[in-house]
Amino acid sequence: MRFYAVDEYITRYGTPHQNGDMSAHQFVSFGDFERIVGYLKLVGLDLSQKNFRYASNSQLVEWEIARKGHAIAIMNDNIATKFPEFQPVLAEIEPFSIPVWLVAHRELQTSRRIRLVFDILADALSGR
């Protein structure tokens, strides 16, 4: 995972050049922002609730908020690099991990077709 933003965001709010600059920026959070803040502290970023102006339990909504230039998003490199409008923010820092859970109802996992899709998604999300 890395931070990504579109040109519109960078033009409006400026480019963060070091970890300390990130506290002056807005982010969109997927899921529980407190948990994400905890993971980000592990990579040296001191962010708080005020930095997360937007939050959603839908990654599509998170993506659109960032794509419209309203916030920086945390994205998987494999996905973000397929969209030229997104550029890495603080590209020099090492990619970091945030646990991602891929879940399905137990009944769906017994279907061979669903299991195949599930396994393909798991491989793609893990970077295999």
Regions flagged by a language model, labelled:
Residues 92-128:
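A late-sequence structural motif
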